[in-house]
């Protein structure tokens, strides 16, 4: 122990405690560390009091040093695989340092795929959707490959999908049967397939195709017929339009009817029962000549002399 008097009435004493006889102080180094830390804090307080501009930097350095010490202690303790997912994220971040685990491997793969998708999306936005088109093409190719594999994995599907080659006799029998019956029931299909040495499915498909061809031909014939009808109706319509235009032209020009003679009428005299021709105009009808009469021309309305008929007994 040492004491010091600076002349101001203050005394400073230091005691290390090595001369004490307590064995617990010798085995426990904590009092020494606590004393050193307390003296360090007193020294910092005095220096901060003398230099207030260094307070902030000192506290920052203390916190940084404490963080580094905690990180070092956690690294020395080791990493537990069975920890919460937060430790998995730490493992992924420290992957470059050589620390690996099953969870870290899975998380790193998933994060790599996610970053790849983000990069592809960004490239697609910049390149005007080219990446999306490429992805669509790859998807379609993959789907097409799957369908090809499925088709090829079937038992006998490729052979059944080949075009059926029929002999002349088989084709003739099928045509004759189709003329009689355009559709067949299952029994007829089985009998015909057995007769022609074919499968029932082949006979059914042939009849389906034959009906489709017949319907197509009938549709073509109907189209031709309707086309001819349309042409005839078009010609008839043109002819009628021409006649209508001619009639309208005659109606708009009435002077063409001035030279036509007025219609004549026939009148009968009630006294003589003779027919006289009269006209609607002011002209007088021409006189009627009587060949049996020695008299000259007479008016048609003049009275005619009546002759007596000879009696039957006068002869």
Swiss-Prot record:
Residues 226-247 are annotated as: Leucine-zipper. Signal peptide: none annotated. InterPro entries: HD, HD-ZIP_Homeobox_LZ_Class_II, HD-ZIP_N, Homeobox_CS, Homeodomain-like_sf, Leu_zip_homeo. SUPFAM superfamilies: Homeodomain-like (SSF46689). Pfam families: HALZ, HD-ZIP_N, Homeodomain. Probable transcription factor. PANTHER family: HOMEOBOX-LEUCINE ZIPPER PROTEIN HAT14, HOMEOBOX-LEUCINE ZIPPER PROTEIN HAT3. Belongs to the HD-ZIP homeobox family. Class II subfamily. This is Homeobox-leucine zipper protein HAT3. It comes from Arabidopsis thaliana (Mouse-ear cress).
């Amino acid at each position: 122990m040492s004491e010091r008097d600076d002349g101001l009435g203050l005394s400073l004493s230091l005691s290390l405690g090595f001369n004490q006889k307590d064995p617990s102080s010798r085995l426990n180094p904590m009092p020494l560390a606590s004393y050193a830390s307390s003296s360090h804090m007193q020294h910092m307080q005095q220096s901060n009091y003398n230099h207030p501009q260094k307070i902030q930097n000192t506290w920052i350095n203390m916190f940084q040093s404490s963080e580094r010490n905690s990180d070092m202690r956690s690294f020395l303790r080791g990493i537990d695989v069975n920890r919460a997912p937060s430790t998995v994220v730490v493992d992924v971040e420290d992957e470059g340092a050589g620390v690996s685990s099953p969870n870290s491997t899975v998380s790193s793969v998933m994060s790599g795929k996610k970053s790849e998708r983000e990069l592809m999306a960004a490239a697609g936005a910049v390149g005007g959707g080219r990446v999306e088109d490429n992805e669509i093409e790859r998807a379609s190719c993959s789907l097409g490959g799957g369908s090809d594999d499925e088709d090829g994995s079937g038992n006998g599907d490729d052979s059944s999908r080949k075009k059926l080659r029929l002999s002349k006799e088989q084709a003739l029998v099928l045509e004759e049967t189709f003329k009689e019956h355009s559709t067949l029931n299952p029994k007829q299909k089985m009998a015909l397939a057995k007769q022609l040495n074919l499968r029932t499915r082949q006979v059914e498909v042939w009849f389906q195709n034959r009906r489709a061809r017949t319907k197509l031909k009938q549709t073509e014939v109907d189209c031709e017929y309707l086309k001819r009808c349309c042409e005839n109706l078009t010609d008839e319509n043109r002819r009628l339009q021409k006649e209508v235009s001619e009639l309208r032209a005659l109606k708009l020009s009435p002077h063409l009817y001035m030279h036509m003679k007025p219609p004549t009428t026939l009148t009968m005299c009630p006294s003589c029962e003779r027919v006289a021709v009269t006209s609607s105009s002011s002209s007088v009808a021409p006189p009627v000549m009587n060949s049996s009469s020695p008299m000259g021309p007479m008016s048609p309305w003049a009275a005619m002399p009546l002759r007596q008929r000879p009696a039957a007994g006068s002869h």
